[in-house]
């Protein structure tokens, strides 16, 4: 109660919305500390920029919020609950979950020894272990063999749930592509369509490290991929294709009817300094998503159409919203103006320094008008920097 302060919509957020990443939250900075008090961490609420159940936008905050709900319902810390109900029953003796990894001394020590490499296989020195503040949303750290045990338990449908119907419900679609019965998400597991099968799974990424877990329930085959090399996405994407076959593409009709234009990922920072990334990182021109390397290799299948008054590309992880020409002009125009403003500030300070050196060398005093003019430039420059 009174936990979420920045809710824009009256529609309640459900646990299923959090699993489907459809609570409507903007993206949130990951480097926010390692506070062990999850309740205090959850009070740092990101803005709600979409109405619940209308847009898929991956949210670490939403996942952490689900973990906090588990704490409130169970009366245990999230880490203790997971140890008791998952790690211990499955014999996962080398996996930790707390922000400082103090719940497993072995993992805590081994984590300090981890190394990551560049694309040429050279050791990257000076890397500091990545800390994700919202620890239920990715802080789990353990060995490959523990992750394999977890994957086997999920694939064999044993130990974790007592009733068979719970397993069936867990693996059923909780969110589908609009107008189809093709699943996007199954209670937190992302669906990937291959030509001859379908997988459910999830991945995790931090600088230099990637982990992927996929389950093919139809054939009873699963895969776990862990990589500690930069550009690791190539391994995480390509290796499953060797196991499950080619990814299924969107229908010919979807590709034919797709509306080309500028699209923006729904997962964005809506305000603050990081919002600038939505212009040049999260926005791109799409003619046919099936010809876009990132979409084709990572997702394969997609649909598109009108929803809620806007045309969008429907994908796992993050939908992509089509932008109007006016939106594009405003965004890139703002970026140009911001660049000019920063250039103005740089020139003001540079000219000021050069002028001082000139007067110092020639022993000339500046007049009162020059002093007022300098103060005006410095004040304007300081205001611009403060805004940014």
Where are these regions (language model features)?
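Electropositive phosphate-/nucleotide-binding environments in soluble metabolic enzymes
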Residues: 141-144, 233, 237
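Short, well-ordered beta-strand elements
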Residues: 202, 212-228, 312-315
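A short acidic/small-residue loop/turn micro-motif
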Residues: 131, 230-232
């Amino acid at each position: 109660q009174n936990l979420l302060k920045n809710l824009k919509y009256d529609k309640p957020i459900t646990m299923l919305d959090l699993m489907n990443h459809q609570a409507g939250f903007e993206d949130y900075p990951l480097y926010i500390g390692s506070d062990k008090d999850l309740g205090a961490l959850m009070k740092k609420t990101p803005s709600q920029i979409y109405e619940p159940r209308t847009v898929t936008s991956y949210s670490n905050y939403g996942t952490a919020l689900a973990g906090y709900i588990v704490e409130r319902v169970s009366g245990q810390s999230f880490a203790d609950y997971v140890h008791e109900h998952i790690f211990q029953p499955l014999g996962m003796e080398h996996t930790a979950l707390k922000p400082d990894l103090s719940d497993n001394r072995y993992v805590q020590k081994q984590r300090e020894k981890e190394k990551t490499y560049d694309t040429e296989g050279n050791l990257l020195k000076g890397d500091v272990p990545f800390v994700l503040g919202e620890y239920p949303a990715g802080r789990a750290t353990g060995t490959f063999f523990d992750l394999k045990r977890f994957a086997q338990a999920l694939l064999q449908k044993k130990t974790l749930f007592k009733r068979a119907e719970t397993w069936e419900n867990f693996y059923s679609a909780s969110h589908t592509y609009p107008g189809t019965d093709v699943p996007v998400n199954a209670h937190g597991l992302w669906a990937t369509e291959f030509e001859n099968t379908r997988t459910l799974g999830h991945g995790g990424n931090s600088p230099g490290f990637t982990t992927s877990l996929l389950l093919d329930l139809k054939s009873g085959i699963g895969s776990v991929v862990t990589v500690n090399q930069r550009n690791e996405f190539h391994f995480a994407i390509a290796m499953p294709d060797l196991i499950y076959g080619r990814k299924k593409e969107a229908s010919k009709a979807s590709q034919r009817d797709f509306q080309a234009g500028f699209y923006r990922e729904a997962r964005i920072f809506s305000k603050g300094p990081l919002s600038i990334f939505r212009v040049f990182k999260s926005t791109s021109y799409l003619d046919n998503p099936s010809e876009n390397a990132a979409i084709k290799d990572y997702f394969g299948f997609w649909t598109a159409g009108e929803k809620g008054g806007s045309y969008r590309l429907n994908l796992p992880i993050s939908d992509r919203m089509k932008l109007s020409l006016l939106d594009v002009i405003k965004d890139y125009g703002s970026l140009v103006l911001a660049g000019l403003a920063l250039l103005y500030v740089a020139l003001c300070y540079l000219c000021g320094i050069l002028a001082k050196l000139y007067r110092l060398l020639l022993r000339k005093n500046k007049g009162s008008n020059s002093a007022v003019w300098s103060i005006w430039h410095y004040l304007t420059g300081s205001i611009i920097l403060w805004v940014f």
